[in-house]
């Protein structure tokens, strides 16, 4: 399925976060076969930064799966969490991705047919169901990462997840 809106038009202001054009952003986990993707940095008024990464796949096939070998490293150290969004809650994951000597905190979920999935098996099932019911296999991997931090406090995770929760309803306007 096609995107509802072009990802390049995604908001540059989200709550008290503003796009940061100075930051060089690269995706931590690549979906090399993604049909549409973007990585953007946002900065809060207190200087905190987050990177938002969205990788959208129109169709999946063997070797080009949304949930597969490419995303397996995300799940190795993942712990479930819940994003509090306006209508309720969205399941997500917390994980740490090691890049060189840096440990990067990441909140991520799969966005399939307007629903967020943290569990990779449920995400795969949702894709299969969507293929049978709607004849499509599209979906997205959404990641919110921050700079490495010394403290792994609950408060730091909550702030990161608050940004992720603000992103979720906006994604509904873009992703099918």
Where are these regions (language model features)?
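Short glycine/proline-enriched loop/turn "hinge" motifs that connect secondary-structure elements
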Residues: 131-137
């Amino acid at each position: 399925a096609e995107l509802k809106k072009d990802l390049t038009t995604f908001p540059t202001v989200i709550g008290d976060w503003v796009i940061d054009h100075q930051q060089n952003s690269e995706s931590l986990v690549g979906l090399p076969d993604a049909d549409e993707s973007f990585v953007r940095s946002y900065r809060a008024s207190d200087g905190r930064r987050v990177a938002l990464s969205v990788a959208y796949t129109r169709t999946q096939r063997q070797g080009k799966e949304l949930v597969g070998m490419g995303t397996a490293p995300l799940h190795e150290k993942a712990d479930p969490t819940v994003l509090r969004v306006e209508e309720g809650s969205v399941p997500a994951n917390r994980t740490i991705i090691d890049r060189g000597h840096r440990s990067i905190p990441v909140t991520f979920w799969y966005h399939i047919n307007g629903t967020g999935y943290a569990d990779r098996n449920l995400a795969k099932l949702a894709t299969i169901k969507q293929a049978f019911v709607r004849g499509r296999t599209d979906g997205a991997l959404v990641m919110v990462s921050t700079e490495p931090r010394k403290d792994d406090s609950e408060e730091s995770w909550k702030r990161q997840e608050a940004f992720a929760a603000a992103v979720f309803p906006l994604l509904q306007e873009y992703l099918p």
